[in-house]
Regions:
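Divalent metal-dependent hydrolysis catalytic cores, especially in the metallo-beta-lactamase
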Residues: 26-48, 147-149
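Acidic/histidine-rich catalytic cores of soluble enzymes
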Residues: 182-191
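Extended substrate/RNA-proximal surfaces in nucleic-acid metabolism proteins
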Residues: 7, 47-180
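Histidine-centered catalytic micro-motifs
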Residues: 1-5, 43, 206-211
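Flexible inter-domain linker/hinge segments
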Residues: 225-249
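Short acidic/histidine-rich active-site segments
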Residues: 202-218
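Acidic/histidine-rich helix-loop elements
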Residues: 2-19
Length: 249
C-alpha cells in the first residue's frame, strides 16, 4: 500500500490519494478491510518515518520483537520501501525495475533510508529512481535485516521482465537464491509465471498496490503462520517450517 501524503500534508506518492496516510491505512485495515497484515511501502521517506514515530507515541501501536508494528492488538504493519533500480538490458541499453524492500523494525528502515539517500535524489518521495542495480540493492537491504522482492515483474516499463531482462537470474547472478518470492502485479497471474522455468522454486505474492483507501486489499495473500509478525510472514514467503502461502487472490 502506498502513502499519498504525510500527516502534515507533505507529498509522498503524487498519484495517490491525499487521505492515504500511515494512520488512515491502519484504521482502514482495522475497521473495514478485515485483514491481519498490511505492508506499507513508502516508509523510507523521512516524512513518513516521523509519522510512524508519532503513531507509536499514541499508545495504539507498538513494535514487537519478531518484527512489525501491531495496531490495536490486531493489525500487523510491515514497513517497506519501493525502490526503482537501473539495470543494463541484454542489448546494452538501460531499463528500470521496481523492488519491494521490507524491514522488521523502524530502526532498520531508518538506517536503510539514510543509506539510500546517497543513491536517490529525493528520498522524501515514493519510488524514486536510484543510481544502483538490483544486484547492488539486495546487499543494502540485507545490511538492514530486510528482504527484497522484485515488484510487479511483468509490468511494462518499470519491471524486470517488462523492461530489463529475459532472465531474472541474469540480474542477480549468484545472489539469485536470495530472491525467495516475486510479486505478480495486476498484469499477470500464477499461470503466466508458472511458464517461466527460472521461477519454478520461487513463491508468488499478489498485492493491491493501493493508491487510495478503498483499493486496499483489492488483491491479497492468504498465509499459514504460527502468529503474526515480520519473522513469521517471511517464513511463509520462504515456505519454511511448515509456514506457507496458501493462496493469492
Amino acid at each position: 500500500v502506498h502513502i499519498g501524503r504525510s500527516e502534515n500534508g507533505k507529498p509522498i506518492k503524487i498519484t495517490a490519494a491525499k487521505s492515504l496516510n500511515f494512520a488512515n491505512i491502519a484504521k482502514e485495515c482495522f475497521e473495514r478491510k478485515g485483514i491481519d497484515v498490511v505492508g506499507i511501502i513508502d516508509c523510507a521517506s523521512p516524512y513518513v518515518i516521523e509519522d510512524i514515530e508519532n503513531f507509536l507515541k499514541t499508545g495504539e501501536a507498538y513494535e514487537i520483537e519478531d518484527g512489525g508494528i501491531i495496531y490495536k492488538d490486531k493489525i500487523c504493519i510491515i514497513l517497506g520501501s519501493e525502490v526503482e533500480t537501473t539495470e543494463t538490458r541484454e542489448d546494452g541499453k538501460h531499463g528500470c525495475a521496481h523492488n519491494l524492500c521490507y524491514f522488521p523494525s523502524l530502526k532498520d528502515i531508518k538506517g536503510f533510508s539514510n543509506e539510500m539517500s546517497k543513491h536517490i535524489h529525493n528520498i522524501t518521495l515514493s519510488t524514486q529512481k536510484s543510481d544502483i542495480s538490483g544486484y547492488e540493492l539486495i546487499d543494502i537491504v540485507e545490511k538492514y535485516n530486510g528482504v527484497l522482492i522484485p515488484a510487479h515483474i511483468f509490468t511494462p516499463f518499470k519491471s524486470y521482465y517488462g523492461n530489463c531482462t529475459e532472465r531474472l537470474s541474469r540480474i542477480f547472478k549468484e545472489k539469485y537464491d536470495k530472491i525467495f518470492a516475486v510479486e505478480l502485479g495486476l498484469s499477470a497471474d500464477t499461470y503466466i509465471a508458472d511458464e517461466i522455468s527460472e521461477l519454478a522454486n520461487k513463491n508468488f505474492i499478489t498485492n493491491s498496490d493501493a493508491h487510495s483507501l478503498p483499493k486496499i486489499a483489492r488483491e491479497y495473500n492468504k498465509l499459514l503462520v504460527d502468529k503474526i509478525s515480520f519473522k513469521e510472514i517471511m517464513k511463509a514467503i520462504k515456505m519454511e517450517n511448515g509456514r506457507k502461502i496458501l493462496a493469492n487472490y
